[in-house]
């Protein structure tokens, strides 16, 4: 019998499809020392997250967790990986942006989002109404806002000026606009 044909039956053969965890020597020593403490293994934990300073997370995926029976002290075995939630959120936002832009491109390629939505800038410009003087003028506040510059004239503030000074709305509006939206100066001007 030659050495090539020799087959040694070993009881430690691992069946196909089985998962085997190989532990380092220091980890085996730590496990053996912890067995003497009477720790109970906690089943069903799939992820352990430890928060460190500056929102840095230590994440242990598929850990082995043991609990001390006398206190709320847990011992976790597994490979810890550093995870930064800020960078993870940024990557997730980039992925969402890419997915939404891809969906928009696909919708645009299929003819737009809805019926009647312009497919190009030229179509949008052709559909835009022309601005001529026969169009009805916008109501009160919008006209005042465009005439008064970069601030908005609100009817509540005009009514407050009228109540404080006793003048009519036209004078209150004029004072408010001349004071560039400063409510107190408009009231002081009219008194």
UniProtKB/Swiss-Prot annotation:
GO CC field: cytoplasm; nascent polypeptide-associated complex; nucleus
Protein's GO biological process: cotranslational protein targeting to membrane; protein targeting to membrane; protein transport
Composition bias, Low complexity: 127-139
Domain UBA per the UniProt entry, residue ranges: 153-191
Region (Disordered): 126-149
Subcellular location(s) of the protein: Cytoplasm; Nucleus
One GO molecular-function entry: unfolded protein binding
Domain NAC-A/B: 24-89
InterPro entries: EGD2/NACA0like, NAC-like_UBA, NAC_A/B_dom_sf, Nas_poly-pep-assoc_cplx_dom
Keywords carried by this UniProt record: Cytoplasm, Nucleus, Protein transport, Transport
Biological function: Component of the nascent polypeptide-associated complex (NAC), a dynamic component of the ribosomal exit tunnel, protecting the emerging polypeptides from interaction with other cytoplasmic proteins to ensure appropriate nascent protein targeting. The NAC complex also promotes mitochondrial protein import by enhancing productive ribosome interactions with the outer mitochondrial membrane and blocks the inappropriate interaction of ribosomes translating non-secretory nascent polypeptides with translocation sites in the membrane of the endoplasmic reticulum.
Quaternary assembly: Part of the nascent polypeptide-associated complex (NAC), consisting of EGD2 and EGD1. NAC associates with ribosomes via EGD1.
Family the UniProt entry places it in: Belongs to the NAC-alpha family.
Name assigned to this protein: Nascent polypeptide-associated complex subunit alpha
